[in-house]
Swiss-Prot record:
Pfam families, A to Z: PRA-PH
Organism lineage: Bacteria, Bacillati, Bacillota, Bacilli, Lactobacillales
Protein name per Swiss-Prot or TrEMBL: Phosphoribosyl-ATP pyrophosphatase
Pathway the protein takes part in: Amino-acid biosynthesis; L-histidine biosynthesis; L-histidine from 5-phospho-alpha-D-ribose 1-diphosphate: step 2/9
Major localization class: cytoplasm
């Protein structure tokens, strides 16, 4: 689905449509896009905290959409992200190698 969202956002950037929210974001620039990513991520956290599955699903969809717009704006493709995920797959966490946090 991220690939589909990415392609749609890329198409909208290359073929602007008047009144498009996606074009509004591109016109406002990276700072606006990042602000929206942060806002939507916070709303996912709130939905999860409230154990509201509908809200979690809706807000996660919003996060994915805004991430796709951010990827287009920054020139990072879903394939780039997938390559990182594939490289990480199967690796053990290094949590046991980290120093214990004792000073809060």
């Amino acid at each position: 689905m991220l690939e589909t969202l990415y392609k749609e956002a890329l198409d909208r950037k290359n073929n602007p449509k008047e009144g498009s929210y996606t074009n509004y974001l591109f016109d406002k620039g990276l700072d606006k896009i990042l602000k929206k990513v942060g806002e939507e991520a916070t709303e996912v956290v709130i939905g999860a905290k409230n154990a509201d599955k509908t809200e979690i699903a809706n807000e996660t969809a919003d996060v994915l959409y805004h991430l796709a717009v951010m990827l287009v704006e920054t020139g990072v493709s879903p394939e780039d992200v997938e390559a990182v995920l594939r490289a990480r797959q199967g690796k053990q966490s290094n949590v046991h190698d980290r120093k214990e946090v004792t000073d809060y």
